[in-house]
UniProtKB/Swiss-Prot annotation, chain B:
Spans through the membrane: 3-23, 28-48, 59-79
Protein name: NADH-quinone oxidoreductase subunit K 2
Subunit note: NDH-1 is composed of 14 different subunits. Subunits NuoA, H, J, K, L, M, N constitute the membrane sector of the complex.
InterPro entries attached to this UniProt entry: NADH_UbQ_OxRdtase_chain4L/K, NUOK/Mnh_C1-like
Enzyme class: translocase
Organism: Streptomyces coelicolor (strain ATCC BAA-471 / A3(2) / M145)
EC number: 7.1.1.-
Topology in the lipid bilayer: Multi-pass membrane protein
């Protein structure tokens, strides 16, 4: 009886590993289903797959464990993340139900299916437990290789054909033929003139020499800031910095000091008038 | 611990994946749930391989992985081309087969 039990159970270490990592795997799977954003789902699924790789290693499937990490978490999940980035990370699933009560029915179906599967396993007579030790005696990779290239050689060849077909299929599906001719630079310029858009290059940002940062609007001759000088992206993000009066006053103080040191008396009239007018405008 | 527990875990993961396919409407997440189901099957295969003491289960799991890789490549290409034509990855919007 005890011998049978010993053959039937695994070591305590593996049991602890199973219960700890199994919980993580189930939580990861649940998060995959219930996270609203696709990126979070993908990351949770990657975690579950790594846990499964550890289980493969614990079950003596060393080759599959490594392949799981390299192919699944390394290649497939990264491909998923690439597509999520293409489609848009911020696009969260809408929570509006299109079919009434579909979510609860789906949960009910899932529950029923799970109960069916688990009671099925519980009733099956799984008396046989041989352990993988003997099969792995000559090495796991060698054992798999000798089986693949003898008994499963046709399946292996067909898998190769499948992979080639999939690669060609993906290229055909994502390749897009250009239907119209790309417009030349001359045509684009003529169109711009016809539409009456702003033709010359846009004015540079920055206020005098102290603020040539791109997020500060340049001043027009009358001292008012011009929105046109700041890049469109910054304008749409609302990241334009104000030309504060304090900075202007600083600048004026600096110039006055410079003038005193240089012992200049007359101030250039254009500068002076620009300051005064900007002050008036701000008031 | 009885190694049959691995089968229970596989059944649980498969069920979660199947429920996800029914609940979610984002095509990418549905696809991820399918991957989860495939992985659960692989775990069951590996556990069976250990129970029976031969490597056939592991080889089937290996073939499953190759087929899953091919499936992901084609499936994601379909999702990308759907997104290009409809600007949405929701399975509700793709009610017609034509693009």
């Amino acid at each position: 009886m005890t011998e049978q039990l010993a053959a039937y159970s695994t070591s305590t270490g593996e049991a602890v590993q199973f219960w700890v990592l199994g919980t993580i795997a189930v939580i990861g799977a649940l998060c995959t289903v219930f996270m609203r954003r696709a990126v979070h789902s993908a990351l949770c699924l990657a975690g579950t797959m790594i846990v499964l790789a550890v289980f493969y290693l614990a079950n003596g499937a060393y080759f599959l464990g490594i392949v799981q990490i390299v192919v699944y978490t390394g290649a497939i999940m990264m491909l998923f993340l690439f597509v999520v980035m293409l489609v848009g990370v911020t696009a969260a699933d809408s929570l509006k139900e299109t079919i009434k009560g579909q979510r609860w029915l789906a949960l009910l179906c899932g529950l029923g299916f799970g109960t069916l599967l688990i009671t099925g396993i519980g009733h099956a007579s799984l008396g046989e437990f041989n352990g993988i030790g003997q099969a792995n005696a000559n090495g796991n990779v060698e054992g798999i290789a000798s089986l693949i290239f003898t008994r499963y050689v046709f399946a292996f060849e067909i898998t190769g054909i499948l992979l080639i077909t999939a690669a060609v299929g993906a290229m055909v599906l994502t390749h897009r033929e250009r239907t119209e001719r790309a417009r030349t630079q001359r045509e684009l310029a003529e169109q711009r003139v016809r539409e009456g858009k702003y033709l010359p290059p846009l004015p540079a940002p920055g206020v005098y020499a102290r603020h040539n940062a791109v997020d500060i609007a340049g001043l027009l001759p009358d001292g008012t800031p011009s929105e046109l000088t700041v890049s469109k992206t910054l304008r749409e993000r609302g990241q334009i910095r104000d030309v504060s009066q304090e900075a202007l006053n600083d600048l004026r103080a600096l110039e006055q000091r410079a003038e005193e040191r240089l012992e200049r008396t007359a101030v250039e009239p254009t500068f002076k008038s620009a300051y005064e007018r900007s002050e008036e405008a701000s008031k | 611990m009885n190694p049959v527990n691995y089968l229970y875990l596989a059944a649980l993961l498969f069920t979660i994946g199947a429920t996800g396919v029914l609940i979610r409407r984002n095509a990418i997440v549905v696809f991820m749930c399918i991957e989860l189901m495939l992985n659960a099957c692989n775990l069951a295969f590996v556990a069976f391989s250990r129970m029976h003491g031969n490597l056939d289960g592991q080889i089937i799991a290996f073939f499953t992985m190759v087929v899953a890789a091919a499936e992901v490549v084609v499936g994601l290409a379909i999702i990308v081309s759907l997104f290009r034509s409809r600007h949405s990855a929701s399975v509700d919007d793709a009610s017609l087969m034509k693009l």
